[in-house]
Design a protein with these regions (language model features):
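Gram-negative bacterial Sec-dependent N-terminal signal peptides
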Residues: 2-20
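Zn2+-dependent metallopeptidase catalytic domains
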Residues: 19-204
């Protein structure tokens, strides 16, 4: 009886493993191989988009933490370039989701937009209002002459520095909290306006 139970348990475990292995992989985590890098939209579900967005957020958070916790002198390469080129998965997922959230939007995609909009707003504020991160950016900005940057690199540095300032990096804690609240409200209003506009456009 013990042997029968053992083999039954082993068979069940193998079956469960087989089911897990058969679960379709998220297409957003693989390279798009179609011509011109077109996404395989027919294979991507709303759950895939949600999973991709959340993973992309976590990856970018890890990149930001690595910059902040680095003991190296802030430079264009280890700070500005990482900020400029980081968040690759998040950009890919949001860029792929974009067309589906406009003309071909469904109730599911609209619901995902509403779910993620305040999360994206908070994520952006967490980056651009982060005092420790801005200190690294400012250190590169204030000492840019010694880095012998190219014209393009200077432009990237200026744009990123301005983005931090425009997004509230120089505000005090109370002002930042108020701006965060306004940003969240604005993101939801912009989303609602966009969804209403799409709805009316599709009716005509």
């Amino acid at each position: 009886m013990k042997f029968k139970n053992y083999f039954f348990a082993a068979a069940m475990a193998a079956a469960l493993c087989g089911c897990a292995e058969q679960k379709p992989a998220n297409p957003l985590f693989s390279d798009f191989t179609a011509p011109f890098g077109i996404a395989p939209f027919e294979e991507i579900t709303v759950d895939h988009f949600r999973e991709g967005m959340l993973k992309g957020l976590e990856e970018q958070k890890a990149e930001i933490e690595a910059i902040i916790n680095s003991t190296e002198e802030p430079t264009f390469e280890n700070t500005i370039k990482v900020l400029d080129q980081g968040g690759e998965l998040l950009r890919k997922v949001r860029g792929t989701f974009g067309p589906l959230s406009s003309g071909s939007a469904t109730d599911e995609t609209r619901a995902l937009q509403k779910e993620m909009s305040p999360i994206f707003s908070a994520h952006s504020d967490d980056i651009y209002m982060n005092q420790a991160l801005f200190a690294k950016v400012k250190a590169v900005y204030d000492n840019k002459a010694k880095f012998n940057l190219t014209k393009e690199e200077n432009t990237v540095l200026q744009n990123i520095y301005d983005r931090f300032v425009d997004s509230g990096a120089l505000l005090n804690d109370e002002q930042k909290a108020e701006l965060r609240k306004l940003n969240t409200e604005l993101s939801m209003l912009q989303l609602q306006f966009g969804q209403n506009l799409t709805h009316e456009t599709n009716k005509t």
